[in-house]
A protein has these predicted regions:
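Catalytic nucleophile-loop/oxyanion-hole region of alpha/beta-hydrolase
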Residues: 634-635, 641, 649, 654-693
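A glycine/proline-hinged amphipathic helix-loop "lid/cap" segment
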Residues: 263-270, 282, 540-610
Length: 731
């Protein structure tokens, strides 16, 4: 008979729950593992729709904790289909006798934290109440299908199917009139297969999505060979990579090459049939709209090359979101399907569905009858399964109410007010933006080690602090803010579910950076956590990941170049490196006008670049000085920053060059700065600026030049300075 009081209750027997069960046994914890389905596999148990397939190569989408599996299980394809992935899960479960530790067909109806006993009370669909010290949600990110938000769904008398809850026995559409509503991943994967059988297929599309062919075949030989040669290194690189797959990060900007060159590079990645390779072609496609447009146009070109009807091709081409800002899809003949005479595409933007009827669908000015309707309307992703589990923490607060305006977690693993509650691949972790197998193993390892640490050190509870949780929220937001992801209405942002908060759910900073943050937390004595036992308490409050993500990204990029330290370079070498780096940077926003000119400095002419706002003038003026340690840089080297300053402040920015060391030692730069200020003041009206509203600005060494210029003007009766903008000034 199962114990009613255990150390750990785990909800879910997908890949996360299975591995955690194995580790709980190994470390001697008592447990109950509850699974709503009647078999293991999680998302691969529930999602049996035709064409369901993993978009991560099988060389990478697998467990690493059991080395024997690498020899005992051989994948048949590069991108495995759902039946094979489910068989893999079953194979692992049988090999490690996991079936005996899982209670199938058992749902959790609710869970409450008991502050007096420091334990969770778990209520199940069987009527049993289980108490436990630790409660783990291994419920998966894509396990709760989204209900169709369409009028009249209950009226239809034909067959209704939901891709996320496909019948186990399969469906035969031969000779049927079929409607598919939705063109996300499940729609794109299932539509070609349904079209092979259906007499008539009508696809209702609201938003076109990017997709590429899988070019499926055997597992990629180059990675197979790498794994054989040095599996340990390969897997280590995966764990500290950006996505959980050990790909070499690109150092090429999409804006530094011609379109022809860019398309050639993208074509090479396209032929590999791997989404990650395509997305990794350029270093800036996720952070710069113009760079992303290069990739997006390549993808639209591919659609036009396949779909024969230009109007249909245009409808299937995404324009309203950037490549990767919604989950790209991987297909087997999706776009080719729309060349078939019995397949029709309906644009819901011009012909919206008015209602589902008893016999079909009323849309636009038409009514059509169907034998079957397939809802490929996606999932309540990442938070749906957790929130619907009716979890109540301290002081009677439910997780649903706490997350009303967006999920709040620390590391995507825990949440304030819910002691000893853990979420595997929860919101605030890389999860759906990663190779899930790598992320699952990392989370399970972290939870296992934390439970062991608590047991060995006499702690009963662990809970994050409000400071740490808020700090992590800010860090996750900062990471998202430097990308273009927030421009899209995607399920990454919760935008596919009416009423769901619109925030970035997954952590976008990368698998490796996330892992290092988790390691830092542990190495600093569980930074940001409060641990308590009957006789002791520990709280090492603080913030993890305090470096701004864009700065971290730049430093990480520089480290990949394996360059000598800047201070060891000669002036000539440093200047060459600076110019090359500047050329690779994404351009800043558009401004009204950019003109170059020369002005009189303290000892000869100085070049300048003027950035004029798009609004009518005259404008306030900021005289800007570039950074570069007084040795390198120029009036154009901070171009993206100057554009941004101009656009955001509605100010005329005049970036002025100055003489550099060692050829022109101190005080040459400062003298040039003051001379430039006086020239700009004297010529303000001709430049379109306001002489009475002049500020000085600068970055790094340029910040120093700006500050000294202001002092010189004050002390010698020069132009009146309205203000100083000093960005990381050298002092």
């Amino acid at each position: 008979m199962a114990q009613s009081d255990v150390d750990v209750v785990v909800v879910g027997a997908g890949f996360a729950g299975m591995y955690l069960l194995h580790e709980l046994r190994k470390t001697g914890f008592s447990y109950r593992v509850l699974e709503a389905g009647d078999d293991v596999g999680g998302t691969w148990y529930w999602n049996r729709y035709p064409g369901a397939r993993c978009d991560i190569a099988t060389t990478d989408y697998k467990y690493t904790w059991d080395p024997e599996l690498h020899e005992q299980w051989q994948w048949s394809e590069k991108h495995a289909a759902q039946p094979e992935i489910l068989r893999y899960a079953q194979f692992v479960a049988k090999k490690h006798d996991l079936y005996s530790g899982i209670e199938f067909k058992t749902r959790v109806d609710g869970a409450q934290w008991n502050e007096a006993t420091k334990r969770w009370n778990i209520h199940t669909s069987t009527g049993e109440t289980i108490t436990c010290q630790h409660y783990v949600m291994a419920t998966g990110c894509l396990s709760v299908p989204k209900e169709p938000d369409i009028n009249g769904t209950e009226k239809f008398t034909g067959n209704v199917y939901v891709t996320g809850r496909w019948p186990h026995e399969g469906v035969d559409f031969t000779g049927k009139r079929v409607a598919v509503i939705g063109t996300g991943s499940s729609g794109i994967q299932s539509i070609p297969h349904i079209a092979e059988q259906a007499k008539e297929l009508v696809v209702f599309q609201r938003t076109p999505n990017f997709s590429m062919p899988a070019f499926n075949g055997p597992p990629p030989q180059d990675r197979v060979e790498r794994l054989k040669a040095d599996r340990a290194t390969y897997e280590h690189e995966a764990r500290y990579s950006g996505t959980g797959v050990p790909l070499e990060d690109s150092t090429v900007s999409a804006l530094s090459v011609t379109q022809e060159e860019a398309f050639a590079m993208l074509e090479k990645a396209w032929q590999k049939g791997e989404l990650l390779s395509l997305g990794n072609t350029f270093m800036d496609s996720a952070i710069n709209r113009k760079a992303n447009d290069v990739v997006a146009e390549f993808m639209r070109m591919k659609v036009r090359s396949v779909v024969k009807d230009p109007e249909v091709a245009e409808l299937l081409s995404p324009y309203k979101h950037g490549y990767g800002t919604k989950r790209p899809c991987m297909d087997t003949g999706y776009f080719e399907t729309f060349n078939k005479p019995h397949v029709r595409l309906v644009d819901l933007n011009t012909s919206p569905i008015r209602s589902i009827t008893e016999t079909g669908i009323d849309f636009g000015k038409e009514s059509m009858e169907f034998d079957a309707i397939v809802y490929a309307t996606g999932f309540d992703a990442m938070t749906g399964a957790i929130v619907s589990a009716n979890i109540t923490g301290k002081n009677g607060v439910t997780l649903k109410s706490k997350w009303e305006h967006g999920p709040l977690t620390y590391l995507g693993l825990t949440s304030v007010g819910f002691p000893n509650l853990y979420m595997i691949t929860g919101p605030g972790s890389p999860s759906v933006l990663s190779n899930m197998m790598v992320s699952i193993e990392q989370h399970v390892d972290w939870i296992r080690d934390t439970l062991v640490h608590m047991r060995e050190n006499g702690f009963d509870t662990i809970e994050p602090t409000p400071l740490a949780e808020e700090g992590w929220r800010v860090h996750c937001t900062d990471c998202a803010d430097i990308t273009i992801f927030q421009e899209a209405n995607s399920w990454y942002m919760g935008a596919n579910v009416p009423g769901k908060p619109r925030v970035m759910f997954p952590y976008i900073g990368g698998v490796g950076r996330y892992r290092m943050a988790c390691e830092e937390v542990v190495n600093k004595g569980f930074l940001g956590f409060e641990l308590a036992g009957s006789t002791k308490k520990q709280c090492n409050d603080g913030l993890v990941r305090q470096v701004q993500p864009d700065v971290d990204m730049v430093l990480d990029f520089i480290s990949t170049l394996n360059l000598p330290a800047m201070e060891t370079m000669s002036p000539t070498e440093a200047r060459a490196f600076s110019e090359a780096s500047s050329a690779m940077r994404p351009s800043g926003p558009e401004v009204g006008e950019i003109t170059d000119g020369v002005l009189q400095g303290a000892d000869g002419e100085l070049q300048y670049r003027l950035y004029r706002p798009a609004t009518p003038g005259p404008h306030p003026i900021a005289v800007y000085f570039h950074g570069g340690g007084w040795v390198f840089g120029s009036h154009t080297s901070d171009d993206p920053l100057c554009r941004d300053l101009c656009a955001q402040s509605n100010t005329l920015i005049i970036s002025v060059n100055y003489r550099h060391a060692p050829e022109a030692p101190f005080p040459a730069a400062a003298e040039d700065g003051f001379a430039a200020l006086k020239w700009v003041h004297a010529n303000a009206a001709a430049l379109g600026g306001l002489a009475e509203k002049i500020a000085v600005a600068g970055w790094s060494a340029g910040g120093n030049v700006a500050a000294v210029t202001a002092q010189m003007s004050r002390d010698t009766g020069g132009p009146q300075i309205s203000g100083q903008l000093l960005l990381c000034p050298v002092t």
